Structure formats: C-alpha cells, structure tokens
Amino acid sequence: MQSIILIGKPNVGKSSLFNRMARQRIAITSDISGTTRDTNKTQIHIHSKKAMLIDSGGLDESDELFKNVKKNTLKVAKESDIILYLVDGKLAPDDEDRQFFYSLKKLGKPIALVINKVDNKKDEERAWEFANFGVKEIFNLSVTHNVGLDELYEWLEKFLHEEFLIPDEEENLEDFLEYYEEGKEFQFKEVDQNHIRVGIVGRVNVGKSSLLNALVKQERSVVSSIAGTTIDPVNESVVHKDKVIEFVDTAGIRKRGKIQGLERFALNRTEKILSHSQIALLVLDAHEGFNELDERIAGLVAKHYLGVIIVLNKWDKSEMDFDKTVKELRLDRFKFLAYAPVISVSALSGKRVHVLLDKILQIFENFTQKIQTSKLNTLIENATRAHPLPHDYGKLVKIYYAVQYDLAPPKIALIMNRPKALHFSYKRYLQNQIRKEFNFEGVPLVIASRKKGSKENDES
C-alpha cells in the first residue's frame, strides 16, 4: 500500500488535516505548538483508492527533542510515496520552511505545498507569497472549515494505484474475468430475497433501542435515558409485505477512552453485526446535533459496503431545517454516503417510523439488483458519446464493454485498453449515470477497470 506523509513545523495543522482525512480524531489537536511529537498512521480511502496516511512530528530546530523528531521524519519521508508539506497561511513564508521543503524535494517524490488556515480573502492574498517555493503543486486549505480538500484529493488520486476496498475483491474479479464470455449474461450468486438483515448503529443514546421498539411495536430492548443502557445486541424480526426483516440493535459506540468492560465488547460486536448485515440504519440525534463520532461510525458503515439509510431521530425536538440538514450531511459530513436516503423520525412517538420499513425493502431491491448486460453497455456507450473519455498523454482511451459481475453490493467491471487512465472524476460521472438510469439509491456502487485480455489493471 502506498503512503502519504504530512510534514511541517509545529502548529501548522498537520494533526487536524490528518483527522479530517481519516474522518476520526486520532492525533491530539490543540493550539499549543508541538502537541504531536510521535508519528501517527492510519489507512484512508481517497475516492476508490487506499493509502496509508502518516502524521509526522513537527519540524523545529529550536527544541532539542524536536531535532530527533526531524531526523525521524526525514527517514519516514524517504520511505513514503507522496509528501504533503504544510505551512501556516496566517504567517509569512520563512527561510526555515524553504530549507525543509527543498531538502524534501531532493528526494524526487511527488510533493505538494499545502497552505493551511486560508480562511478568508486576506489569507488568500498572503498565500501568493509562497509562490517563491518554486513548486507547481500548491493547495490553499482551511481544514477547520473543510475547504480546499477536494482539489488536494484529486491531485493525490493521480499518484495512487487502483485498489479495491472490499477484502478478496481482486481475486473475485479475476476469477470472474477468467471464465466470462463477452456479451453473455452472468449467473449471480443466490441471495435470499425474503430475508433482510438490518443493523441498527449509532453513538450512545441516539435512540436506537427506541427505534427498534417502534419498528417491531413491542418493548424488546430495555429503553432508558441513561447513556449506554443497551449492552447486548438484540435480534428481532418483523414481517412486512411478505418479507422477513431481521433487526439487530447494537450497543452505542462511545468516544475512545470511555469504552470500558462490556461496552468495549459491544463495540467489537458492532463490527461483527455490520459484517453480517445487508443494510444499516445509521441513527443520528437531530436534537443534540452531529459530531465527529457520527462521521467515524458512518465510515464504519461505508467500510462494510452495506445498503444504508440515514435516520434523523428525535426530529420532533429538533429546530433544524430538513433540506439544509440533508445538504450538510451529503456535501460535508458524509460525502462518502451521498447516495444514502435521509429520513426524519421520532422513535418515541412513532412518527414516520413506518416509512422506514418500505424504504428498507426498496434499498434491499437496489442492493440485489441485476442489470442486463446489453442495457448497461448501451448506457456506457451513450455516456461516453455525450462526454468522451479524456486522452492519456495523447493516447486514445477506450471502454470495450461493461459487465456486472456481482451484487449485494452491485459491482461493475469496465474492460478497457488503458484502465489506469480512467480518472476518478470520470468514474464518478459513470457512476452517476448508472445510478440515474437503474436506481441505486442507498447502495454503494463498485466500479473496477481492467485491461482487455489480461488480469492486470494497467497498460503493461
């Protein structure tokens, strides 16, 4: 797996950027210069690609301890694949930053200058002063306000290899391509269409037990206002329109450091429940509001590639505007779950809970949907005609054909002449076209590109 290292002097926002990219609070962040002195690592996803993100200690010659940190940072940088050098956009460039940057540039690796804390027009004007670093790749960010990250991700994506996010997916696809005959319909795995497994997840005290009780219309789980009352996962089934929906009520996920004893076991059990679920109800507290822990749990759902419905519970107590809230979730907090429907309910009063049952059936139908190969290829043909594939350094890029090779979740292979040239933005365009035509609401859609006549996903 390729690695991305964040380097810079203390207090430029490395840990904040690390947490933002990792979608969870791992590194300690504060306004005190030099809070992070140890190297932190975590695996991240940038679009359809994986990478190891490394948060280095701050570089500062003025502190004896930091001399060792700098030495270790440079060592890690030599072993990394991509370097992001952070500076503080509130301050003018200094020679020390330039020296650090030039020493890293000599390593011959992809390197970008990231100017953080660019929060307003005045900061943008000041950022021009960093042009004398002599680097083409400069990105203005405001990590605090989540501004500028999309451009940075787009640049990083160019240097990352295509990897599947689902375990063993590589082997599954290669086995499929070995025996698949172009133009033929594929015999999919059998999925029980009459039994749906639904995991209910969320942080502590968002109302998961109350929601379960409302869904099955009986007091099955112990409901209390005390945070973390439900410890043991509880299964309950309900028949809706001749379909058996099996619900699992999970223990709430607490913040790190507060997980003790049975609660720690329950967190591990939540992972297991998701691994055996097909659809997740991600429950949020619309009265209390959302936080970074909600994002972490959402990331857990995305990691398992489940169908998902975002449930805004306690809506009767909320003062939020529904449309603005949905926009915030899809464009900011949960960009990676933008395909998920959002439903507001009040579990205690039972208001709008019935809507969830119909929506679960619909999402499950999308989750197990089979696209006819001829219809899929007609769509791809029309999409590429409307917006032709960009050339790859002057060479023509072609999609020979497309085929769905799995379901639950749906997975589509694009057989191409130059699969590595398929930019993530064009892949996203194709995903949007497929979603629009075949209705994949609430469902992750996996698209893989492969070279025709080869098991390799490159041009060699």
Curated annotation (Swiss-Prot):
Chain ranges of the EngA-type G domain: 2-164, 196-368
GO biological process, alphabetically ordered: ribosome biogenesis
Molecular function as annotated in GO: GTP binding; ribosome binding
Domain KH-like, residue spans: 369-453
Keyword GTP-binding in record: yes
Chain sites annotated for binding GTP 2: 202-209, 249-253, 313-316
Pfam families referenced in this protein's UniProt entry, alphabetically: KH_dom-like, MMR_HSR1
InterPro entries associated with the record: G_ENGA (IPR031166), GTP-bd (IPR006073), GTPase_Der (IPR016484), KH_dom-like (IPR032859), KH_dom-like_a/b (IPR015946), P-loop_NTPase (IPR027417), Small_GTP-bd (IPR005225)
Residue sites binding GTP 1 per the record: 8-15, 55-59, 116-119
The keyword GTP-binding belongs to this UniProt entry's keyword annotation: yes
Sorted UniProt keywords: GTP-binding, Nucleotide-binding, Repeat, Ribosome biogenesis
Origin: domain of life: Bacteria
Annotated family: Belongs to the TRAFAC class TrmE-Era-EngA-EngB-Septin-like GTPase superfamily. EngA (Der) GTPase family.
HAMAP family: GTPase_Der
Function: GTPase that plays an essential role in the late steps of ribosome biogenesis.
Record text on subunit structure and interactions: Associates with the 50S ribosomal subunit.
Name of the protein described by the UniProt record: GTPase Der
Annotated source species: Campylobacter jejuni subsp. jejuni serotype O:2 (strain ATCC 700819 / NCTC 11168)
The encoding gene: der
